[in-house]
């Protein structure tokens, strides 16, 4: 698949186009231009490295939304075996913006839940652009309780712009469904490991992210509102999104510094979409390390640790100037 380049990546796109053109010419030419191709390839790699070393929060937001970025289903296919998808909330419908089911991780039975976006117009509509309705969160709750019943570790993957704000969703209890999931996850008697793989949008993300260990991919985001939404409220213009992204502190490094996440999983040069299999391999190691730390921990200790973790959020100390 041809790589889609973002606006700020245009210098890289131009170099890659030149490299592709030379490769095409080389196939029909007696002149050896392999050295020139190699030189431009190294230049492209260095340019990508320089660019990705100095990303702004707004640029990170764009990468987190990249249309070719791996989604939950992609990670399920790469990281888990014997996946058996479970459908429906047993109350209203089956929301396809949430996928989940039984699987094995490194041979160990587990439960997997995550947001799922679409690749083309038809699938995006089918998946509601990764924005769950109440029935999606209630399906997730059902699978969480199944994981608890059978003593299975729970892996969740977060990638949503937010919960669906439609009238029907509100009528069916969107806020109640999200709140219920927060309550259930806080008390679940099994290890929970959550990973933000793309967008972590507000309560729609948090509803499957109350965990014993929270990971974030290097170029993912996690915030209470989108930069555009924040800009529209504070500055009455979505054009101020770059400033809003900076103020929101939505990047993995910022959230790690605040103690809101536990680990940052490095991405391949240019982002996860440049090397999905390489990204999956790095994430596998991170998930295995996170799961290992809860091995042998009693249910009471696990829940107490989770409770202490949640209660520590937002704590601060007041100091007297000059003290």
Swiss-Prot record:
Gene Ontology terms describing biological process: fatty acid biosynthetic process; malonyl-CoA biosynthetic process
Keywords: ATP-binding, Cytoplasm, Fatty acid biosynthesis, Fatty acid metabolism, Lipid biosynthesis, Lipid metabolism, Nucleotide-binding, Transferase
Superkingdom, taxonomy of origin: Bacteria
Chief localisation class: cytoplasm
Cellular component aspect of the GO annotation: acetyl-CoA carboxylase complex
Keyword ATP-binding on entry: yes
CoA carboxyltransferase C-terminal domain ranges (all copies): 39-293
Membrane-spanning ranges: none
EC number: 2.1.3.15
Enzyme class: transferase
Catalytic activity field: N(6)-carboxybiotinyl-L-lysyl-[protein] + acetyl-CoA = N(6)-biotinyl-L-lysyl-[protein] + malonyl-CoA
Record keyword Membrane present: no
Entry's localization field: Cytoplasm
Pathway(s) per entry: Lipid metabolism; malonyl-CoA biosynthesis; malonyl-CoA from acetyl-CoA: step 1/1
NCBIfam families: accA (TIGR00513), AccA_sub (NF041504), PRK05724.1 (NF004344)
Known function: Component of the acetyl coenzyme A carboxylase (ACC) complex. First, biotin carboxylase catalyzes the carboxylation of biotin on its carrier protein (BCCP) and then the CO(2) group is transferred by the carboxyltransferase to acetyl-CoA to form malonyl-CoA.
Family: Belongs to the AccA family.
Protein name: Acetyl-coenzyme A carboxylase carboxyl transferase subunit alpha
Organism the protein comes from: Paraburkholderia phymatum (strain DSM 17167 / CIP 108236 / LMG 21445 / STM815)
């Amino acid at each position: 698949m041809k790589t889609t380049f973002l606006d700020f990546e245009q210098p890289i796109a131009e170099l890659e186009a030149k490299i592709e053109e030379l490769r095409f010419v080389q196939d029909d030419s007696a002149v050896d231009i392999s050295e020139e191709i190699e030189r431009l390839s190294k230049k492209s790699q260095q340019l990508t490295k320089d660019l990705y070393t100095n990303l702004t929060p707004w640029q990170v937001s764009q990468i987190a939304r990249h249309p070719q970025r791996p989604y939950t289903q992609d990670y399920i296919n790469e990281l888990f075996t014997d996946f058996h998808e479970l459908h429906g909330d047993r109350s209203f419908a089956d929301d396809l913006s949430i996928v989940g089911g039984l699987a094995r991780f490194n041979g160990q039975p587990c439960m997997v839940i995550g947001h799922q976006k679409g690749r083309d117009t038809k699938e995006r509509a089918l998946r509601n652009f990764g924005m769950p309705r109440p029935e999606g969160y209630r399906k997730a709750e059902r699978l969480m309780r199944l994981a608890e019943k059978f003593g299975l570790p729970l892996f969740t993957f977060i990638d949503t712009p937010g919960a669906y704000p439609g009238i029907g969703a509100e009528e069916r209890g969107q806020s109640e469904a999200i709140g219920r999931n927060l309550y259930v996850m806080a008390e679940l008697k099994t290890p929970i490991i959550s990973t933000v793989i793309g967008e972590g949008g507000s309560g729609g993300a948090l509803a499957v992210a109350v965990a014993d260990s929270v990971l974030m991919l290097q170029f993912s985001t996690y915030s209470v509102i989108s930069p555009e939404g924040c800009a529209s409220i504070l500055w009455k213009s979505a054009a101020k999104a770059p400033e809003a992204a900076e103020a929101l502190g939505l990047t993995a490094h910022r959230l790690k510094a605040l103690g809101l996440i536990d680990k940052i999983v490095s991405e391949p040069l240019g982002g996860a979409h440049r090397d999905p299999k390489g990204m999956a391999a790095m994430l596998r190691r991170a998930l295995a390390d996170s799961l290992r730390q809860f091995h042998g921990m009693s249910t009471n200790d696990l829940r107490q640790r989770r409770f202490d973790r949640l209660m520590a959020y937002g704590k601060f100390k007041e100091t007297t100037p000059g003290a």
